Amino acid sequence: MAGYDLILRGGRVIDPAQSIDGVNDVAFTGGKVAAVGRDLKPSAGTEVRNVTGYIVTPGLIDLHTHVYWGGTSLGIDADEFCRNSGVTTSIDTGSAGPGNFAGFRKHVIERSEARILAYLHVSFAGIYAFSKTIMYGESQSMHLMAPRDAVAVAEANRDVIVGIKVRVGLHASGDQGTAPLNVALQVADEVGMPLMCHIDHPPPSYEAVLDMLRPGDVLTHAFRPFPNAPCTAQGTIKPAVLEARKRGVLFDIGHGAGSFSFKTTRAMLANGFMPDTISSDIHTLCIDGPAFDQVTTLSKFLCMGVPLPEVIKQTTVNAAMALRRPELGSLKPGNVGDATILSIEEGSHDYVDVMGEHMTGDKRIIAEGTVLGGKFFHARTPERFAPSKPRARA
């Protein structure tokens, strides 16, 4: 039997998909996970990295990002984001539509070292006017809805397109209500893919959007502030939210610049309502705050009392299941060889939501390193996790 290419030695491995939480080694061969266990034996050519005292998880998946760098005003660099945030799979959510997806694929997705998958926007040019100087919702004009083109592009790019995206709300769709969502759902039905729906201020209402979503569809910005919050001012979860969860609608955080509230989150968690996935909605207008990155978004939930394994679950296996990509999100042997190395820094840390409310947390998740496709990709400190190779046996 051939030896391992890489072993991460002695970290606390947290893999919620396999109910693993303990000190283990993780081995990779041929770009895939090869084994998880104690004292895995290297061969002469195995690269060994000592991660004792650190946390090793499946490669983090950020279900809501904008990484069409250079092609849209809101796009950030996916590889830089991966290095800083420990994210090995970025899901771009509608930056590109059928009219410009070919450029996104050729110039960004195929050139990126980090993995990029995408929700295709039903609007022809995706999210094209989103900056500090100009803001125009792409769903405000139904003339820009391109259902036939979207079907054709989604069918031709099934290897990287995981679903259909639409944005509705006062800022994104003006007075169009749920009309853009209706078109997007028709596209999603036609290609047999899930849909992700953005929601902002009404119209339409939170309830009206939820009523249209199907099992497996994702409502992003799910813990947004008033108006269109999922709970009342008294902290009661709206009945439509509970009904949607029962039928299988997924609730994603999508922090961003305007879509995550501590007040809402406290109410939802107090009622035992966890999001299905935690994502950053990282883009040019929130990368310098209040979202910053995926690990900062995860840290907020950790500091609000969500146990670390549950936080990891929502950015690994839960995200993979939302994508219908079971080869991601777990360190199960045979899965894609991605892993993230994390640490927890104790102390006093300031966090802020989109309403300007500050919260002092007692810990912070730090991305220390990543493994991409079975190869060590990045360490926050160059000398940390320096590789070693065992001597060949005589």
State what each model feature region is.
Residues 1-57:
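Histidine-rich, glycine-flanked metal-binding segment
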Residues 263-344:
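His/Asp/Glu-enriched, well-ordered alpha-helical/loop segment
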Residues 50-111:
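Metal-associated gating/positioning segment near the N- to mid-region
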Residues 11, 26, 31, 53, ...:
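Divalent metal-coordination and catalytic microenvironments
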Residues 166-288:
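Active-site core of metal-dependent hydrolases
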Residues 11, 336-390:
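C-terminal cap of metal-dependent C-N hydrolases
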